[in-house]
């Protein structure tokens, strides 16, 4: 994508699986070679749209909680093939989907995101119309809380819904 569409900006928001030190180092090298690739640590705001990976949906997280959570992930090494096979089996059996459905119901999940935003972005409700995030693997769109619409693009994992979403951009990015 970077080579074939070098005239476009590609924004990559790091998530927990991306925080492994060797991976982030490789991404930094890649982005230094390709100026069209923009790497964002926790969020990207473009106009009145906010994009997050979504780890803050695990529990009510403030910024220091997110930093600790990601630090733990950064220390991980690649899982052995047996873990990947076990994860794949759980997906085939529907266990992963069942867990996600129980642990990430929309109202609870969106309230966790709102709590996180309250801690990291003062007055976000006045600055944001739409918040896009992932992590939970559960697709939904236009869940409204306090006038802000929340969207989750789901997951491309077998048995989960994947929901690519369109949005309109009006100005230049502000990000962290």
Regions found by a protein language model. Give the residues of each.
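Extended recognition/assembly regions associated with phosphoester-bond processing machinery
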Residues: 1-176
């Amino acid at each position: 994508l970077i080579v074939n569409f070098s005239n476009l900006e590609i924004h990559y928001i790091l998530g927990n699986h991306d925080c492994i030190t060797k991976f982030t180092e490789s991404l930094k090298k890649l982005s230094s070679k390709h100026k069209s690739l923009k790497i964002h640590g926790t969020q990207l705001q473009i106009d009145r749209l906010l994009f997050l990976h979504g780890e803050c949906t695990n529990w009510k997280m403030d910024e220091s909680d997110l930093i600790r959570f990601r630090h733990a992930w950064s220390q991980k090494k690649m899982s052995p093939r047996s873990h990947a096979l076990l994860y794949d089996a759980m997906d085939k059996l529907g266990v992963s989907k069942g867990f996600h459905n129980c642990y990430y119901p929309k109202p609870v999940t969106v309230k966790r995101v709102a709590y996180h935003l309250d801690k990291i972005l003062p007055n976000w409700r006045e600055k944001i119309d739409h918040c896009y995030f992932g992590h939970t693997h559960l697709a939904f769109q236009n869940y409204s809380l306090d006038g802000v619409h929340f969207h989750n693009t789901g997951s491309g994992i077998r048995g989960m819904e994947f929901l690519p979403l369109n949005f309109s951009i009006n100005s230049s990015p502000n990000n962290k």
